[in-house]
From Swiss-Prot:
Keywords: Glycoprotein, Membrane, Transmembrane, Transmembrane helix, Transport. It comes from Fusarium sp. InterPro entries: MFS, MFS_dom, MFS_trans_sf. Pfam families: MFS_1. Belongs to the major facilitator superfamily. TCR/Tet family. It is found in: Membrane. MFS-type efflux pump; part of the gene cluster that mediates the biosynthesis of the mycotoxin lucilactaene and the lucilactaene-related compound NG-391 that act as cell cycle inhibitors with potent growth inhibitory activity against malarial parasites, moderate growth inhibitory activity against cancer cells, and no activity against bacteria and fungi. This is MFS-type efflux pump LUC4. Residues 1-15 have a biased composition (Polar residues). The keyword Cell membrane does not apply. One of its GO terms (cellular component) is plasma membrane. The gene is LUC4. Glycans are attached at residues 192, 302, 461. It is a multi-pass membrane protein. The keyword Protein biosynthesis does not apply.
Amino acid sequence: MGQSQDNTQLTTASPQAEKDLSSNDNPPESEPAAPKKGARFWLVFIAIALTTFLAALDTSIISTALPTITSDLGSNSLYVWIVDSYLLASTATIPIFAQAANIYGRRSLTLIAVCLFTLGSGLCGGAHNTAMMIGGRSVQGVGGGGILTMSEIVVCDMVSVRERGMYAGIIGGVWAIASVIAPIMGGAFAQNVSWRWIFYINLPIAGVVLVALIVFLKLARPPTGTFKEQMSRIDWGGSVLLIASVTAVVLALSWGGSEHPWSSWRTLVPLILGLVGQLAFFAYQGAPWLKEPTMPLRLFGNRTSSTLFVISFVHSMLLFWVCYFLPVYFQAVKEASPARSAVMLFPIATTSAPGGVIAGIFITKTGKYRVWHFVGFALMSISCGLFTLLDDKSSIGRWVGFQLLFGFGTGFVFTSCLPPILASLPDSDVATATGAWTFLRNFGSIWGIAIPAAAFNTRVNSSLDKVSSGTVRDMLVNGGAYEHATKTFIQAFNNTPRLKAEIVQVYMDGLKLVWQVSIAFSVLGFVLAFLVKSLTLRDELNTEYGLEEKDTSKEKSSEEGNAS
């Protein structure tokens, strides 16, 4: 697969370019071996996995219950912010948590993230109006973004670079399973108990996790100065630029094709301002006076890390692309209920998780990761091509088989990206690099909904001349087709089979373009994989923030719980 055979051993002393980092053939004698994994390690890892499960649940658990929530609270057109407020808050705060983890320590930031998520869950569960719900979702989103960031950082601090693929695969599997079962849980709570339990269910689980983290998450923390010195290290300007630019982009992508046409100034102005703001953010990150930027440009200073950041963005975009538009096919073409369509996505969840673990184990055993980029994107490209064949007559075997290919492919790619990113950078950049990786994945998910939505709406608009009813054409134009992609809407035309067939054909036309465009991005990921270099993933663990050893904690480090 074009994999080089260099026996690169990385050092961690300085943020050199990749060429410099990969020049040493022998590991430094002072580099410590990875500690054995005792009961405390596994208790912390399980707690981290549970927090990831909760954060993943709340990205999509309200999707099937949203009509019930909006009806109960009288949200009307504000319903979209019940979803977008969480996504916006979590995405914008990810790099900020990553930088703060280097200043205030991993333990304190992890506990803060879980506490904010729990507080937000309580506010949402007790919400009596839309404003309180949106506020609660925003608080929950900040906590969720912190959980995603800190869980990856803490795991990276506990295991060596070579092992990170396997543990990332497990965390990724937890995420995939939670994302698929979330809509089913949301619908079940809304129909059988109360939609409020969608949020209340987080409280006891988060409480147990919080206790476990307080008791067992004892991490080393190097001295970081006084409170004033710590505050002066925060990149306030970069944080403001990042939050403002991400907010503008999310607003534009939320409005485009639904609230306002894509050609409307109300969509274009915030989109352009947001993209310009992000360029300004990266320009500011390179300012010579900025000692500790939120997202240092050195993270993108070598070919391997910069390429893998782009690959991770594309991969996340494709994952959300498929998971948001297969339900449109299931509900509008195959006439499945929302809960049933969530179940029909199980093939992706049941293969992406084991696929990630398989790739992670292979990477841990051999240190080879490039092959998984090629295999993963090859499977994703093939499956996206096969999705174009789906129609109203497709058998269960077809849509299940196509998803199995995509699921394994996405699992392979997810697990094999972060370890080589960290291998190409010094260990001092673990937190910021992991934060950048998580941010780009979240940001990619936003585009993974917006781009196919634009393609779908464009093709639907051009295909509406096939629909004989002017009333129905008005219902489906300019984003209406996505809104009406439900079993109830389609079956309302059972008494007019010709009109129903015309409507279904419009949906199939729109979805075909969605899958055709996805092929291009899948192939792009495959091509980008050729730019990734083969680096040695070291077995040693060299970090200042790992789990404290009982016999050395008093002499070499101070517990975060006792600091500041």
